[in-house]
Amino acid sequence: MKNLFFNLKDLKKLGKNSIIGKTVRIRYPELVSIGDNCIIDDFTYISTRLELENNVHISSGCKLIGGKKSQIIMKRFSTTAPNVVLAAGNDDYVSG
């Protein structure tokens, strides 16, 4: 399957029988690992290190954000509702 915004070959890992919608945008595909039998629906945006275990479904319009240093891990058989925002990172503004 062809994607409009990145080359599937650039993904860190793409498991068997996984489906990625044509309009999914992945900012750092080299940091994204997708297990077997996963589905990422159209209009999803990913801009963080991501690991999807087997049988994960990300619904349409979701945003998984956090940058290169943060990570989101979705365990097997997990799912999101449409338009969910998952943000990884640390908002520690009190340091020094």
Residue spans of the language-model regions?
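Extended, small-residue-rich solenoid/repeat segments and analogous flexible loops
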Residues: 1-31
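Flexible, glycine/small-residue-enriched loop-and-beta-strand segment within the central core
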Residues: 22-34, 39-96
